[in-house]
Amino acid sequence: CMKMETNGGGAGKIIGRMFSGETLFRNSYTANKDGLIAFASSFPGKIVAIDVEPGKEVIIQKSAFLASEENVETSVFFNKKFSSGIFGGEGFILTKISGHGTCFIEIDGSTVEYNLLPGQQMVIDTGYLAMMDATCKMDIQSVPGLKNKFLGGEGLFNTVVTGPGKIVVQTMPISAVANSLARFFPQGK
């Protein structure tokens, strides 16, 4: 038999979840005997299991948290570069995963993982960074040159991640899918 309990974790936790795009309340499930629980992603993509250990925090895009064991904590992570929030697709409010246990996150599309060396940088289209080790730094950089900005079709800004640490890039963020499909919908007058 499975027991379910809904809890907000206090006003501070609820406000933090509101900022990071999560649901305000969490459901806790406890099995009185052997049992299984299943969960699904809200968009076609991949569910990724993360083994969380003390001192090895992970930063994920807001609203990517799906489920975790009870000793895993989520908190609001503010990107120190305000320009990242104004111009970047990732925003300056992200979610930090810490504690001990397994956490599940949902990623749009497929994933591609990279291990960055200290000081090594990767330039990514904004909105495509799904996850990074907390040892990585993220910044937003303007696309150089007027020709690139206006004729390149890739947007005005890129996300720059600097190692050391692992990063996970998603191949199909929901925002990119929505933009691609929008041109097929009739425009109202």
What residue ranges belong to the model's regions?
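Phosphate/adenylate-binding glycine loop and adjacent helical scaffold
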Residues: 1-189
